Amino acid sequence: MTNRFPAPDYHFSYRKAPVSGNTINGLGEMSQRRARQVFHGSGARKLEWSALETFFGLTMPLQIYIRNALNRWELRKADGPLARKRTPVPDSAKMSKQLKSIARHAGAGAVGITPMTEYALYEGQTADYQSAIVIALPQNYETMRAVTTVKAAAETVDTYRDVSRIVMALAAHIRSLGWRARAYGESADLLHIPLAINAGIGQLGKHGSVIGTEFGSNFRLASVLTDIPLVMDSAVDIGVDDLCLGCQRCTIDCPADAISERQQWVRGKKKWYVDFDRCVMYFVKTFGCGISVSYTHLTLPTICSV
């Protein structure tokens, strides 16, 4: 069955197109380097595509704009003071289990721990922490079936708010033990996807998002960076590469024709990659799109495990 989504016809365009987002992202580069911010910037540098991002924000319905503003306001609590006395951690495995339990009790759908790497940071940014606790929070499946509409956009923003609250609470708990911890609830400052993959949340899919065993791709990510001693999880192989090679669901569904059938070299690594220039225009038109995340086969409730 073919889903009916808005056509990739745009009432907006650049008079002078900026440098390709694919170039900024390092498409075709054989040497490893850190990513550069290209959209949803943190203000660390002037983005080549900032005009489109501004347009995206200005054309958002008021309810979405307010939700985003409230999320940004709440993230002021991402960091905070440490307890004066540090609680020793003689058993890092026990501490890892406790923190995962706290996160799940707060609503997290999946939790993984991985060493922090500089390649999870954008070029020019620093974050001197030992490890990352990655949280995945599922979105409401039925609501997300309305992708490309304001209804689905509101669900996405609300899920980002909820997962941000989880990581802020978890970071605050770690700081109460006397250990440094900072919550990251947005992708503007941290690349959550590579951390999630390394933490065993899932694998990268053809559509550029993580596919996991519990929720498919229908979830949002946030992370806590910390120095508290923890036991690291490992990346998993759940057969996503083989699945994506034989599946064309997202490539067929994508109105912008932005999803490639083959892996490509990106900043020194061969992986699945979505054409930024094609994707971002449709993303802006449709309140954040979300088609591939919601309609990937493993997202469907009846077949969401492998």
What are these regions (language model features)?
Residues 109, 260, 285, 302-303:
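A very general structural signal that marks isolated residues within well-ordered alpha-helical segments
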Residues 231-291:
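Cys/His-clustered metal-coordination modules, chiefly Zn-binding fingers
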Residues 1-233, 238-241, 291, 305:
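Auxiliary alpha/beta "docking" domains used to position bulky ligands
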Residues 296-302:
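Conserved small/polar residues in nucleotide/adenosyl-binding loops
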